[in-house]
């Protein structure tokens, strides 16, 4: 099965959002925000569709890995200097009707704390979202999606940053990221980490067809 990476197009929004909904269905952050599994699985695709819309409006760069006509994984990057515009923030507000009212205060507090911790300086590529369809997880899709972009960072001598739940910290450490700030979500929510990656010497561009 030949896998390849390409830039996402607008028509990928639906399939990619559905994929991300499946990928994050059991993620501790979303379990914390939407504890009811049925509601969570029903509403996450809409949440991610809004996020992908923000990415499209904001000039973010979204990579998808495909095979046999299917999207296996999706990575959303915010380029150096990008910042949400008023329009993007309004689009982001469209996600909140998808949060159960009983969890609205928790969701607002949680995402405010994570957003406040998001790195701003120095300039960097920010990994906004990375998800792999569950049947393709642990088959190299996530690493394959990130490797070309990180090689591009190395070549350009650019930093990269992200925010991750604790379970994924070792994966990102293996790619050169270092945890620099612990985010303790109030109310005993899931711990997250701000992670930075400095460019590695001798970086070379990696082809986007991965196997």
Regions found by a protein language model. Give the residues of each.
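Conserved acyl-donor/pantetheine-binding loop and adjacent beta-alpha core of acyl/acetyltransferases
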Residues: 74-131, 137, 147, 184-190
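A short helix-loop-beta-strand connector motif used in the catalytic cores of GNAT acetyltransferases and
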Residues: 44-64, 122-126
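Conserved beta-strand-loop-alpha-helix junction that forms the acyl-donor binding cleft
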Residues: 128-137, 160-170, 186-192, 197-198
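Conserved beta-hairpin
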Residues: 59-75, 133
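Conserved active-site alpha-helix within GNAT-family acetyltransferase domains
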Residues: 143, 155-157, 166-183, 188-189
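Conserved GNAT acetyl-CoA-binding A-motif
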Residues: 123-125, 152-165
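Helix-loop element at the rim of GNAT/NAT acetyltransferase active sites that forms part
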Residues: 18-38, 51
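A short beta-loop-alpha structural element at the N-terminal edge
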Residues: 4-18, 27
């Amino acid at each position: 099965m030949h896998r390849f990476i390409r830039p996402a197009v607008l028509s990928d929004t639906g399939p990619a959002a559905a994929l991300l909904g499946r990928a994050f269905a059991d993620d501790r952050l979303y379990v914390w925000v939407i504890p009811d599994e049925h509601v969570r699985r029903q509403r996450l695709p809409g949440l991610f569709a809004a996020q992908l819309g923000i990415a499209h409006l904001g000039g973010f760069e979204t990579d998808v890995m495909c095979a046999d006509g299917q999207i296996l994984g999706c990575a959303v990057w915010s380029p150096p200097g990008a910042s949400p515009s008023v329009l993007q923030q309004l689009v982001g507000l469209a996600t909140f009707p998808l949060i159960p009212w009983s969890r609205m205060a928790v969701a607002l507090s949680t995402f405010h704390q994570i957003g406040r911790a998001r790195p701003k300086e120095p300039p960097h590529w920010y990994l906004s979202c990375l998800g792999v369809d569950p049947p393709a997880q642990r088959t190299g899709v996530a690493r394959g999606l990130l490797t070309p972009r990180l090689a591009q960072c190395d070549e350009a001598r650019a930093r990269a940053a992200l925010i991750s739940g604790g379970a994924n910290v070792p994966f990102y450490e293996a790619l050169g990221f270092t945890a620099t700030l612990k985010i303790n979500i109030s109310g005993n929510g899931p711990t997250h980490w701000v992670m930075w990656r400095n460019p590695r010497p001798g970086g070379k561009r990696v082809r986007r067809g991965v196997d």
